[in-house]
């Protein structure tokens, strides 16, 4: 094992030594003309690569021959073994080394890349090509003529033209032989300094011209190769007369240098020769020897007379760096003089470097395809740069032009490897066009560039891409068919078959053209005539062979030029544009395109509108049509006119086109109700109508068209009990349930009709008045309902808003956020102000409590209360609220279950304001039995006295006794000051809120009347203790207006007096309003209902959400701190001026406190549901404590900012909704104000301003009442705004978080709910955890707080 490990390490080290340089050279010798598949060498062995184990490589070792694209290599190499073989290509030394001097070796070089990258090396292999005798020596001519004078001496030598053999060495010319010389001439061979063998003819005998003047013989030349090769030429010798002297050159060897850029005609050298003869024999003739090459003869000119050598053609040092010119000077004799002129052509930097790219990675269509996951340093190509110039002009550097993930690494002189320098990413770059730059060191330097394209391989998800996005071609008319116009080309980022591109003509291509599918050459196949067509615009498609194939196209524009003999041509004979009717003036309607087949000014077209149509304008150059009018499709649906096009020729030509502009409908019309025509249409619905019956049909029309005119109907308000439903398409209003007694009355259903327009739907609303009754004979009732329907607007179920753009939503959200922030700041400010202003008044209230004449408390109780107060002050606990519960229940004389009246006194113990805040005072119902007088309308207990023990021996007629004998016409019902004890009209089952979930003790008092009747007693609250006492009540006559007979019923009275409370809240707004207290209006529901909140419906019973009855859609939320409806009561001194002694003893009632009949026309006598207290008014219905502040009721007015929700009027008051007590009245149901301010919990008006539905402020701006309820763990905020509308003051609910249904009230309905003469409210009380019986359409079941 150790031996193997050592061998492996040695092999690796050896490989590192072998390949440390990154490049190697290896020489082999071969002979020319070698046959194919001859083994030359083995690189694996010769380079010792067999020592490297294959297991150490990621891939097997590979030998790759690197050669220039297009070259035919003379050898091949086995990629797996590294063996080198010859190919079928001929190895011709004379051809490969034609420009090399004969005395130099001939080499053939190739590069071999050894892969993989771990052992990559580039090996340069040099093959020395040995010459073989494959060429015979040849004379320059087949006949050689020479002249010899007759007096030539024996052994005289005359030079003959030498033969030439391309072979070298022994394979070259070795011997000359003279055949058939007749022993007169002989042949000698001499060797020149250059190594050439020159034949010389020797005269062996005397010559006699008169005897023989011509000799003909043969000359043979032989080489020394094997087999030996030879050739012959005819030698013809002429004998001439005697010429004693021969010419002599002044210089026999001349060497000159001349730059290769010397112009033609430049003198190279001047030869000088002399002859001793005279006359004709002294004339010297200069000529080139036959040994001068043809190239030299082509480049240089020799003046035969003067001997001047000049440049005949431009020289090129890179082709032939030097030239040997053998010049002969002859005087006509047989012995010419010889002079050798060596012309050296000096180098000039006139050649740019050349870049030779030899790919290691085989390219595809001259593009190297690389996978994006190839490793770093992957070898791509071998770059060889050369320069034919010499010295510094031939020194070349190579580099790339910009930052790319590839680099050039030098390996040999002027050779570089292109390899990856960073990881490739197909998603970032799909292909690279690498520009290689080569520059020499000349002055100025010359450079050359070459492009190398690399594609990153990926999946076939790319369509072919044309190199040009738009091809423009011009061709003259009357062309010959078959002319090639242009060649289009496209590339595809994919690879393989997916990158193979076929070129096709598009479907719009005319038949005059054809396209080569493979090359993309576009050809004209027909003769073109510009008069028929001046230009062609079509597409050429490039489609790959993928599945499915992907295509791309390029637009080709072929233009033909001719004279102005064509009129402008519209692209269409008629134009139809469609524009929305809300297109602004000068907006863009459309574009008219005109073409003119002519050229230049003749094709300059000017557009105009005919018939002086001023409604539209057209740009004379661009053809853009713009309107000068505003469109209205409902007025005109289309416009038609003609556009004229005129060219700019001398004799202008014109044409016209019809333009029709169609106005497209935009949803700019709201649906308009046809049925009912107004908000004052009434429909009678009989109570016996079966469910599912269509009771009414609404109909609305929309002036728009299409979906903008499609109308859908929905009920959005007034249908609180879900008694009706509407078909959204037909508008049919259907009765959903059987009507019962509680459903009788006028139902004001708010119906919305909205269209289906996009993007914004428009809508309209209408009030459908459905009168559920047996008949319409009761004119008084109908008139009253109609009157109230005009005063009590309808509450929408949800906010109806015309949805606009998302931007408007953002604006609304921003406005709401700002308004909320301002509201919070205002509330905090008001709270601080109220607390500051209450401090002195609370002290005064405590002082006044000591002088209270309302009830004399038991000393024990007083002492106990004071101790509790001290204890609570130490604990910093919230102060208790004083809650007074007064409940009177009356039974009819004919009630078989009645066994007499029993008076029950419930005293709540330790009721804290937190407990009170958690109780749902609004939604907990209390029910009176039928036909009992409405007592809650005028009596409320607001006593500030502490809890006390009831003394049974107290005289019955005592003013301060808890049981009062009341006349039957006195409608007396009182509850705690926080809960709602409202009166209702003729509805026998209307509901009132009277309940409190606290622990109390009950003192039942049985009341006996004549005759005794059985009654059922239900306690409002659980009692700890019970004591029964019997009290007789003498019924009093009722008012005439009520039409009742005295003595037929008794009433049950129950007082609830909380123990130890120092605070109370007044009436929750119960009691009917005087009909005359509202300013009557003749108009209906204002259309601005989204800004106002209304009542859901008005019924004969006037049971609304604002009169204190149980709200069928409100949901009790445990922990919700409910604010009290606050009523400020006047002092007894103020009331005693209008009341009888009986009122002062038994309490105020309709008989004594209010007039017998109501004057509806006397608006100046309008009164509120509460009276203003005169000082001392020491306590408010909500007392500000240290945190947590449990309740805040504030009405934002001009200072002082301490008003609450009720209205204050000067006497004579018409209705009282609370119990009035004898002075000192030290506790009120409103926030305390310093005297003589009459703005306690109500806004005070001095007559004759008597509109109860309106609140007077220091400014006409609407004020905001913010009702804030907070809890330790949850925050519920109700913000109620009051605005002065046409129908009265209306509240706007800003949202109640955590409430199932928003509550909507108006001041008029809140404070003056009804004026009906019959007021019967059945009353019921609840024990803890008892649930109220929900009415139809209730919210989830209301529960009392577990406390």
Swiss-Prot record:
List glycan-bearing residues.
Answer: 27, 48, 54, 344, 553, 773
- Where found? Cell membrane
Q: Which residues lie on this side of the membrane: Extracellular?
A: 24-812
Residues covered by the Cadherin domain: 26-139, 140-249, 250-355, 362-466, 467-570, 571-673, 677-795
The record ties this protein, via Gene3D superfamilies, to: Cadherins
For this UniProt entry, what is the primary localization, expressed as one broad class? Answer: membrane
Topology of this chain in the membrane: Single-pass type I membrane protein
CDD domains found in the cross-reference section: Cadherin_repeat
Cellular component, GO, one term: plasma membrane
Recall the GO molecular function terms of this protein's record.
Answer: calcium ion binding
Q: Where is this region: Disordered?
A: 1057-1091, 1097-1116, 1325-1347
TM ranges are 813-833
Please describe what this protein does.
Potential calcium-dependent cell-adhesion protein.
The name on file for this protein is: Protocadherin-11 X-linked
Organismal lineage? Eukaryota, Metazoa, Chordata, Craniata, Vertebrata
